[in-house]
A protein has these predicted regions:
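Hydrophobic helical membrane-anchoring modules
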Residues: 179-180, 186-212
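Short, high-confidence coil segments that cap the C-terminus of an alpha-helix
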Residues: 42, 92, 121-123
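N-terminal nucleotide-binding beta1-loop-alpha1 segment
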Residues: 1-16
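Conserved core of the sugar-phosphate nucleotidyltransferase
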Residues: 76-81, 103-185
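A short, N-terminal amphipathic alpha-helix
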Residues: 28-45, 52, 56
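Short internal beta-strands
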Residues: 45-49, 127-128
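Short phosphate-binding loop-to-helix
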Residues: 46, 52-96, 104-112
Length: 212
């Protein structure tokens, strides 16, 4: 079974109640729920939350809700422990993590990531981008951006992981597959500025669709 999971706790600090904050006419969480529901590859999809209001919003937008223990909703709670809690209660061979804080996904992105995972059989797959930033003064001279090879950074949009790996307490594994996305999909809402960026990008996408 391929299980999609969106963790959505209620206690976000830098941007309070961000998971249900309205973004271009819908709660932030709803954008991810809609993308998950459009997937043809997910066998089951759940939202994990301890928060009654978030649970109600998730159900309103058509998601199945799995009640999360309050002990797994604190600031120090790891994503791994949240996913392990879900796997302790639901069967799965493959886990697809879809974070509510990444609302911008091209149509079909989730299924393309799952299909890449099935074709290559890695331990884990992550979407992201190539970062070419270097610390100032870190070398004998400052390289031009085009001369820097860069390194892969995950962006929080889509993760696909072998469920057994997670059960063993690992999230990444040894064999990793990368899916490079255009920068407009790399949004990960953590604070008010991130939310503002997400709004502008989403508005632009909606205008492009309306004009097409």
């Amino acid at each position: 079974m391929i299980l999609g999971i969106t963790p959505a706790r209620g206690g976000s600090k830098r941007l309070p109640r961000k998971n249900i904050k309205p973004l271009c006419g819908k709660p932030l969480l709803a954008w991810t729920i809609e993308a998950a529901k459009a997937s043809k590859r997910l066998d089951r999809y759940v939202v994990s939350t301890e928060d009654a209001e978030i649970a109600a919003v998730a159900r309103q937008w058509g998601a199945e809700v799995l009640d999360r223990p309050a002990a797994l909703a604190g600031d120090e709670t790891t994503m791994l422990s949240v996913i392990q809690d879900v796997l302790a209660r639901l069967p799965a061979e493959i886990v697809v993590l879809l974070q509510a804080t990444s609302p911008i996904r091209d149509e079909g992105l989730i299924d393309r990531c799952i299909e890449r995972f099935l074709a290559t059989q890695p331990d884990s797959l992550a979407s992201g981008f190539i970062c070419k930033l270097t610390p100032y003064g870190s070398g004998p001279r400052q390289l031009r951006c085009q001369d820097v090879a860069g390194f892969f950074c995950d962006d929080g949009n889509v993760y696909v992981v072998q469920a057994e790996l997670i059960r063993r307490g690992d999230w990444v594994g040894a064999r990793i597959e990368q899916v490079i996305l255009d920068r407009a999909q790399n949004v990960d809402v953590d604070d008010a500025f991130d939310f503002w960026v997400a709004e502008r990008l989403m508005e632009q996408r909606q205008q492009c669709r309306a004009g097409s």
